[in-house]
């Protein structure tokens, strides 16, 4: 019985990984609307990797999505990333995972960080050539323990 419980525990979901997603307005994501996340770290003694994830539907009009991502400690921006998601290939095929009308892509924006290094993340869609990006359904972060 103890062996079976140990095996079950070893196969259980990793409790130290967290994710947060924010739904985007149906009428589009405005350049003037930054998205802010407060990463949740399950164990302050571990180092973490953070991924930025986007979800879009098949009505998204562009081949890419270019974002500015600020990693902020308690007082200042510690790192600014320009992140470019290739949403579709040159033939118009959607990239990432998904089915039906919804797709998700993710990219690592921080690796092997201590929880005290990043207390908030702000995402801007300032790099796109339009004021309002439509058909991005959700923006999120995925925080997982570093493997290194």
Feature map (PLM): residue ranges:
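C-terminal motif of bacterial Sec signal peptides marking the signal peptidase cleavage site
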Residues: 7-10
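Short acidic/polar inter-strand loop motif in beta-rich domains
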Residues: 56-59, 103-105, 125-134
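Post-signal peptide N-terminal segment of mature Sec-exported envelope proteins
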Residues: 20-40
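An anionic, turn-rich surface loop/hairpin at beta-sheet edges
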Residues: 82-112
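Noncatalytic modules at the cell exterior or secretory-pathway interfaces
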Residues: 44-52, 111-128
């Amino acid at each position: 019985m103890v062996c079976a419980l140990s095996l079950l525990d070893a196969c259980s979901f990793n409790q130290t990984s967290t994710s947060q997603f924010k739904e985007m307005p149906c009428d589009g994501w405005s350049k003037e609307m930054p998205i802010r996340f407060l990463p949740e770290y399950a164990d302050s003694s571990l180092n973490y990797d953070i991924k930025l994830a986007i979800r879009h539907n098949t009505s998204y009009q562009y081949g890419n999505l270019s974002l500015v991502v600020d990693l902020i400690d308690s007082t200042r921006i510690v790192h600014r990333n320009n992140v470019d998601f290739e949403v579709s290939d040159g033939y118009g095929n959607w990239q990432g995972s998904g089915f039906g009308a919804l797709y998700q892509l993710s990219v690592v924006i921080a690796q092997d960080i201590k929880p005290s290094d990043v207390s908030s993340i702000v995402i801007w869609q300032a790099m796109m050539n339009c004021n309002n990006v439509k058909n991005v359904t959700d923006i999120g972060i995925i925080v997982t323990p570093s493997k290194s």
